[in-house]
Amino acid sequence: MNVVVDNLLTHYEMTGQGKVVLLLHGWGDNLMGLSSIQKSLAKKYTVVSLDLPGFGATQAPTTVWNLDNYAYFTEAFLAKLDLKPYAVVGHSNGGALAIRAIAMQLLNPTKLVLLAASGIRDGQTAKRLGLNIIAKVGNAATFWLPKTTRGKLRKKLYGAVGSDLLVVENLQETFKQTVRQDVQADAAQLVLPTLLIYSDADTAVPIKDGHSYNKLIKNSRLEVINGASHFVHLDQPLRVDSLIQEFLA
């Protein structure tokens, strides 16, 4: 399905019936990255998942954006569809977006689920910004390969620093603004019940970020998955689904 939000053609999916659950994907991903969660939750809830601007089938913004812009866009998207989420599930940068939007009072869910949420900017930020250099090197080193092979190899190159933080073409400046925006002060404002799910083997967003958010968000609970990647919901779908279902009930 498609809808025009803030002059951007926006692709989304809405399935199931019941209370509304909003899914927010991470940087470089799209709504398909959370499809397993959508399918599971749709048995009990109305699940809404969208491609954020610049990703999937949604048009890219024409100016440089940061988390605030994405937060305002998310509010406008929900208003357009007249939806009031009971819960928000955010993965990686989608988690940082959820934290920021709730702190700005643009979202007002009853419950929040953060899957390997980013948004804590420490010494690793410079490393992540280095993706711009990796992107340039990747382009130069793989231009001669077939397009499908080229894309896979570049993703491996980017994945060396964190696959969720891929530098999408034409969004490099937006990427820079996003990874510079720390949401720890926003997290400290949150009081709603929050489930944190992190992996102890995540190389993109370290487990210490989960512990930090657990301390910052007063009414939060941290669940640690052993041995999973940054895409913990794909590596351990049954475990993650069980945790989310129990938390939202």
Regions found by a protein language model. Give the residues of each.
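Alpha/beta-hydrolase fold catalytic core
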Residues: 1-21, 42-45, 83-84, 110, ...
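Conserved HGGG/HGGXW glycine-rich cap/lid loop of the alpha/beta-hydrolase fold
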Residues: 8, 13-57
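Active-site loop/oxyanion-hole signature of alpha/beta-hydrolase fold enzymes
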Residues: 49-89, 242
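Gly/Ala-rich beta-loop-alpha elbow adjacent to hydrolase catalytic centers
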Residues: 90-94, 98
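Flexible "cap/lid" loop of the alpha/beta hydrolase fold
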Residues: 99-104, 109-143
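Conserved alpha/beta-hydrolase catalytic His-Asp/Glu region
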Residues: 125-128, 136-192
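Short beta-strand/loop motif that positions the catalytic acidic residue
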Residues: 190, 196-198, 202
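Catalytic histidine-centered segment of alpha/beta-hydrolase-like enzymes
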Residues: 228-241
